[in-house]
Amino acid sequence: MIDDLIYFSNDAVTSTVLLNVGQEVIAVVEENKVSNGLKAIRVEAVSDKWEDDSKNSSKGLSDSSPRVLIGCVTSMLEGAGYISQTTYFSLESVCEGFHPCKGDWVEAEYWIRPGTWSSEAISVKPLRYKRVDKVCISSLCGRNGVIEDSIFFSLDSLKLPEGYIPRRHDIVNAVVVESSQSCYIWRALCMTPVKRDATLGEAPQEPYGALLLKNKGDIEVTRMTSFGTLKEGESKSIVIWIENKGKFSRELVSCRLANWDKAHQFRFETQGRSKSCPGAAAGSVPEGENVNSLNHHREDKTDEIPESRLANSTEISPDGCACKEESREKGNTPEKQEPEPGGLIPPGEKTHIVVTCSAKNPGRCKELLLLCFSDFLIGRHLEVSVVSSEEALIAVREPFSWKKPKSSQTLVSAKTTVVVTTQKRNSRRQLPSFLPQYPIPDRLKKCVEQKIDILTFQPLLAELLNMSNYKEKFSTLLWLEEIHAEIELKEYNMSRVVLKRKGDLLVLEVPGLAESRPSLYAGDKLILKSQEYNGHVIEYIGYVMEIHEEDVTLKLNPGFEQMYNFEPMDVEFTYNRTTSRRCHYALEQVIHLGVKVLFPEEIILQSPQVTGNWSLAQDTKNDGQSITNITRNDGQSMTKVTRNDSQSITNIIRNDGQSITNVTRNDGQPITKVTRNNSQSITNITRNDGQPITKNKKTVKDQTKHTTEERHVGTTDQPEKASSTAETMDEIQIPKARDKEFFNPVLNENQKLAVRRILSGDCRPLPYILFGPPGTGKTVTIIEAVLQVHYALPDSRILVCAPSNSAADLVCLRLHESKVPKPAAMVRVNATCRFEETIIDAIKPYCRDGEDIWRASRFRIIITTCSSAGLFYQIGVRVGYFTHVFVDEAGQASEPECLIPLGLISDINGQIVLAGDPMQLGPVIKSRLAMAYGLNVSMLERLMSRPAYLRDENAFGACGAYNPLLVTKLVKNYRSHSALLALPSRLFYHRELEVCADPKVVTSLLGWEKLPRKGFPLIFHGVRGNEAREGRSPSWFSPAEAVQVMRYCCLLARSVSSQVSSKDIGVITPYRKQVEKIKILLRNVDLTDIKVGSVEEFQGQEYLVIVISTVRSNEDRFEDDRYFLGFLSNSKRFNVAITRPKALLIILGNPHVLVRDPCFGALLEYSVSNGVYTGCDLPPELQALQK
């Protein structure tokens, strides 16, 4: 009790100090509404000692010793900001010279304020920073730029010398800090040029800025120049008056359009003579042409550039010849067209220009009309909004209203719960060992619900992840995600709904279900409530049997199903905690893996699992990445490598030819002295006593003739049998050799290398990472590795997992199609609630074998999802049961989810293989708190940030820049055209991706008549449409973009020259409502075979043509660009979207919005520079790129 008045329990105590009677405490108290008693929900001891430091004392903080927080700046306010969502800091607490920005990683000292139970940082500094010298500005788009393709900077936060304005290709010195800025991990804090140009200090000219629009020289021009909204195909004219209010005559030298509008919708007449936009007369299409022909693209040659831009006002020549412009027509020699003079305007007189707009391009558009006088320019913006007739099909049907439906809050005195009496689970699955519940702590739930700082409950969240806080930190993050899911589900509870009948079952209609609002799966539990007249409530427990669009088929108590007479019911959704409980259980099991697996630092080489010769007919190429040649370009010593047996270490070579001294056994003694001879041969390997163990020479010339297996990085070259001595055989136990062949002979060198390294398993149990960028054959490599392990190691038992059913099904299908495993060797284990209708026919036989978990556990190749791997815990399977665990698409699984299969492998001799791409989609985490503290970082991504797995071009330049003992990066892309691969390769993969796709496929659409530039299969179509929402759905859609998507699909599917099957076209859009609207339009034109979906639905897939609709188009909300852009600001989502197509990529979006994002800004810059941009006018920062 506190003051004999306030009750509290031990759970409410947050301080680590033991409380004593008489001790002063600070408490947060709530009143019990029933008893009117007071209960403390937070109690913290007041320390007897206070710091003398006035700065700390003035803050009124309760703990005298600050704690350390490692986190990311998640928001910035005026003069302050927040770290990891909840920890406040003021700019006064930031170290000198550092001005933090959103995304910066910082190290802070913080306190907990006792009165508010919130954390406040008292010192903030960058987590990591460095200086880079003589680096080049590789990109500059508006206010954002990039240095050396890897360091982001914004002119809004960059410190520059006075008078210096960065320009592309400048050589600069910079100080950079670690920061998550889209696809970049460094941000420039300050920059200085190495050598200043003569033009330094001149501000960049803005020819179309506010100054241009002002009246000048006593000339006044009409300002009302908007055409309003026009239907596509309509025309409208307006008159622009030009009045001379001065004392002297003014000569209107010429009138012209700046040609921002690529659809050439505007033309003007002056003094009775018609004048069209230069460059448009010959190239434009007559007004009467079909409006469905899009934007009437010019058939430019491949090497031609877009129409030239108008010169700015400083380029007016003294002789009065202003605004000269070249025009370029279809394949014709450009001709200079002089604008006709407008004539003299006497004082007090006025003239006029008639501007006509012929609406062609859906969406908003802006053009610039330039009135060129002898010594100045006056400009006026011509604006129009064009709507198409097809937009009526998808117009807003119901005004948007995001109001939570009121649920019944009737106080009840009693309730009765009725459960399903029939067996819910598959009867053939006997699961005697059930997982613990791992309930969410009440204190944590109150923290979230009452918005109390989470660090008051779990200070460990502020620490970097390590072995000591591993379980507690991830357990807390899992609970945070669960709490968010429960809160989110409550918002979708329904009141007084009537169920429909479907045979003997009942069907519940859930609005918004198709948009995953709420997110339901087969097997989830629902509670249906019925209130009697006496206030008594009966709860019926039901389970989801089937989901079709917005209809949910339920399994309830048979008695209720028969007696139900369409009475209104209240519906309460519940969160399925099965996967979360398996994650909690896995966290307890994987502790045995320890630091060596979860936080690897040193490499301990094991004996190879398999030795022998590979078929020379299949493998005759030495790529320099084998075990026989680990090189360092800088001559530095390598990472510590040890061996835990008596065998000699492998040949590890430095470029300087010196031996490496830190290669030891577990007893710390050196094993070998490894040197290098002039002929590149494998050198002598000596024992500790100086006697030769074996002599095995292999020169470059006779590589194809040697009969000894070429070992991979980190293992020993086995001596030839002919030269083996008894002493050698006693010293080294060589596994029985066998000739081996690849089941898939068309694998490339990197793929074969990865298979060998996995098969050898030199670094087990350290996870081996197969880094597979898009289209590089990652899954093919995994299939080969599984088959090789299965046949080379008869004692192996392999668990192959993936985060999703689709990915696991794909692995099973590919193994089936290989026709290598015997039917009794492989099984596909599904979740209990998965419906057979969702399983493809080819793998159904393997799934039937997986229905009995006991029987399935005896198969040697077991395929399942990461979550369903937890079924094996429930039948008593424990550590060491599986010899090999493969996790495909490991980047999409959260770390606790990935741990579920890893908990079943041996920590001594088990082999872990993680395959995926850390630059593509990660785990789906919805709790912002859980994301802020790292639950959205996959195990694959975290390991690749560890020193042992880091990219190091100096140390491992010959091995793909990664330690070949631990990582193989696949770089040969078999999917996309070179023009489509260039940008993602530069942004995400260090320009290393190689084009290896079938030329017949990727060049099949280079002659399509609608390409802005022939031979370049990319279109960026600018659409300044309107974004909208309707009904109760918070999802956005853009009618103008949806119509344009439909038109492109029609043109592709019905093209005479380059017809594309509708099944070869995919449409990606981030919003469910836009998916729905596009499907309506495609259904209207009989193109229902075209797949339309979110980015997540396309990961791992490829299409001949991809059309992307970005939707967001509100240019007025830029107070928080990333929040406003939503899904679009995720660089991983962007990477997946643009790497799906083989032969053609079409992007539709508003360039004025998208330019704010670094990735989309780079795509816009790439498109404009290559002459493939079309559509609406560009933002000012991109206009200069148009030639």
Curated annotation (Swiss-Prot):
BP terms from Gene Ontology: cell differentiation; male meiosis I; male meiotic nuclear division; negative regulation of cell cycle; piRNA processing; spermatogenesis; transposable element silencing by piRNA-mediated DNA methylation
Start-end of Basic and acidic residues biased regions: 296-307, 322-339, 699-720
Effects seen without this gene: Mice are viable and healthy but show male sterility due to defects in spermatogenesis at early prophase of meiosis I. Retrotransposons are derepressed due to DNA demethylation. Defects are caused by impaired piRNA biogenesis during pachytene. The absence of pachytene piRNAs causes disruption of germ cell development and results in defects in post-meiotic genome integrity. Mice do not show any cardiac abnormalities.
Positions of region (Disordered): 273-347, 686-727
Matches recorded under Gene3D superfamilies: P-loop containing nucleotide triphosphate hydrolases
Catalytic activity: ATP + H2O = ADP + phosphate + H(+)
Inducing factors: Isoform 2: Activated by MEF2C. Isoform 3: Activated by Nkx2-5.
EC identifiers of the protein: 3.6.4.13
Keywords, alphabetical: ATP-binding, Cytoplasm, Developmental protein, Differentiation, Helicase, Hydrolase, Meiosis, Nucleotide-binding, Repeat, RNA-binding, RNA-mediated gene silencing, Spermatogenesis
Tissue localization of expression: Isoform 1: Specifically expressed in testis. Isoform 1: In testis, present in pachytene spermatocytes but absent in postmeiotic spermatids (at protein level). Isoform 2: Present in cardiomyocytes (at protein level). Isoform 2: Heart specific. Isoform 3: Heart specific and is specifically expressed in cardiac myocytes.
Region entry 5 X 11 AA tandem repeats of [TI]-R-N-[DN]-[GS]-Q-[SP]-I-T-[NK]-[IVN], spans: 642-696
SUPFAM superfamilies xref list: P-loop containing nucleoside triphosphate hydrolases
Keyword Transmembrane in annotation: no
A GO CC term attached to the entry: P granule
Keyword Cell cycle among record annotations: no
Quaternary structure annotation from Swiss-Prot or TrEMBL: Interacts with PIWIL1. Interacts with PIWIL2. Interacts with PIWIL4. Interacts with HSPA2. Interacts with PLD6.
PANTHER family given in the database record: CANCER/TESTIS ANTIGEN 55 (PTHR45418), CANCER_TESTIS ANTIGEN 55 (PTHR45418:SF1)
Stated family: Belongs to the DNA2/NAM7 helicase family. SDE3 subfamily.
Record's protein name: RNA helicase Mov10l1
Natural source organism: Mus musculus (Mouse)
Lineage, highest ranks first: Eukaryota, Metazoa, Chordata, Craniata, Vertebrata
Gene name linked to the record: Mov10l1
